[in-house]
Structure formats: structure tokens, C-alpha cells
């Protein structure tokens, strides 16, 4: 697989989005399956919303949401996802967590699950589901130690991590491995069906819903 990082990965992701926008919106869907985090994300150090949340006793209030919106609304993903939402393209994010570790989860993981991802989903127009790894395994779904993302006609992108942050991306349409592409398509569609049937649809912060001042 050809792994891209940095500006090359960002440029290729931009091409995938443009492919989505160039096709019939009614035939498009976007799905993200996020693997369970195992490392503290280095980018959280000094990230203002995370620090504001910590100062507020690990609780999100209007100031936390406002800080988050001010920082993230300019992000390319938020802009592209909002454009997709305006075109009626469904966007689903599925976050995998280990039930056995959740009650003793570190603060950074609770921030990701309870603040960061719900805020991204609200601003981007996503549906956000939380699923337990143990339930996925019981249902016969195989583990992934990387993210699997479907960008409609733009194809599937895999994303791997180092020090808790995305380190590389692979665009399967570029590699021509039909077997791998087929397996990942099956996986992401199975995870979507599983999340709808047995996952938790996460309530998103109303402060960031469409129609809010953000």
C-alpha cells in the first residue's frame, strides 16, 4: 500500500472530496469508522478546548463549545463536510471503544468521546455512533487497528496512527488491490449496520447544531 502523509495526504484527500461533489449526491454516502484509541494524542497538548474542559472540572459548558467552534470551523474537513450536508449526502461517524476500559478511562479519552467527537459531528452535520469493541467481536466483526473511511465515489481511505495522531493515509483507489478494497467496503458497511442496530446514537451538543450562531 502507498502510504501518504503531510501535504501529499491532504492534497489527495481534497481530490477525494472533489470526486464526491462531482457525482450524483443521491448516490453518495460518507462513513468513518474510528479504531479505539490506545495512546494519548500528542496534538491535545495545548489544545484550547481540551484545556478549557479540564479547567471546568472535565465538564463542557458554553465557553468550551465556543472555543471549540472558533478553532475548528475553519478546518478543511468541517468545510467539506458541511458542503456535503448541504447537498444531502449522509455522513456517519462510528467510534469504537473498549467497554472493559471505559470506567477507568483517562481524561483525554473521555474528552475525545464526550466532547471532541460530538462537537465535530455537530459542526460537520454527522450522525455519531458509539459502539463497544467487545460487542463488535461477539457479532463476528473483525478488528481494525486503523481508521476506515468511505468518501462515496472518492473511495476508501485508511488512516494509521503514531503518538495518538494520524501518521499516514492510504487511498485504496490508487493501489488497485480489488480484494482489499472489497474487504474494507464490506467491513465499513457491516459496521454501519451494526452501529445502527446495536450502537449508541450520541446526543450532540445543541450549542453547535445547525442554526446556532456558529
What kind of region is each of these model predictions?
Residues 39-40, 135-142, 179-180, 209:
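A short acidic, often aromatic-flanked loop/helix-cap motif at beta-alpha or helix-coil junctions
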Residues 97-144:
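HKD-type phospholipase D/PLD-like phosphodiesterase module
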Residues 5, 106, 125, 199-200:
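Intrinsically disordered, low-complexity coil/linker segments enriched for acidic/polar
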Residues 133-176:
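HKD (HxKxxxxD) catalytic microenvironment of the phospholipase D
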Residues 39-41, 100-104, 157-159, 166-167:
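Short catalytic/ligand-binding loop motif for oxyanion handling, primarily in non-cytosolic enzymes
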Residues 1-101:
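PLD-like (HKD) phosphodiesterase/transphosphatidyltransferase domain
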Residues 162-214:
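Signature of lipid phosphatidyltransferase scaffolds
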Residues 81, 88-94, 114-117, 130, ...:
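Extended, compositionally biased low-complexity polar/Lys-Gly-rich tracts
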Amino acid at each position: 500500500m502507498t502510504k501518504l502523509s503531510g501535504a501529499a495526504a491532504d492534497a489527495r484527500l481534497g481530490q477525494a472530496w472533489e470526486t464526491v461533489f462531482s457525482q450524483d449526491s443521491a448516490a453518495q454516502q460518507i462513513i468513518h469508522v474510528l479504531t479505539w484509541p490506545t495512546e494519548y494524542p500528542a496534538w491535545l497538548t495545548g489544545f484550547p478546548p481540551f484545556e478549557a474542559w479540564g479547567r471546568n472540572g472535565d465538564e463542557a459548558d458554553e465557553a468550551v463549545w465556543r472555543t471549540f467552534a472558533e478553532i475548528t470551523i475553519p478546518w478543511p474537513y468541517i468545510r467539506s463536510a458541511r458542503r456535503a450536508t448541504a447537498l444531502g449526502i449522509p455522513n456517519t461517524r462510528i467510534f469504537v471503544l473498549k467497554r472493559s476500559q471505559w470506567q477507568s478511562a483517562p481524561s483525554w479519552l473521555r474528552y475525545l468521546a464526550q466532547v471532541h467527537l460530538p462537537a465535530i459531528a455537530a459542526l460537520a452535520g454527522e450522525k455519531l455512533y458509539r459502539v463497544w469493541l467487545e460487542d463488535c467481536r461477539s457479532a463476528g466483526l473483525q478488528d481494525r487497528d486503523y481508521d476506515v473511511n468511505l468518501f462515496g465515489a472518492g473511495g476508501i481511505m485508511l488512516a494509521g496512527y503514531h503518538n495518538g495522531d494520524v501518521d499516514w493515509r492510504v487511498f485504496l483507489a490508487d493501489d488497485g488491490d480489488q480484494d482489499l478494497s472489497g474487504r474494507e467496503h464490506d467491513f465499513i458497511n457491516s459496521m454501519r449496520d451494526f452501529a445502527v442496530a446495536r450502537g449508541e446514537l450520541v446526543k450532540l451538543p445543541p450549542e453547535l447544531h445547525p442554526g446556532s450562531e456558529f
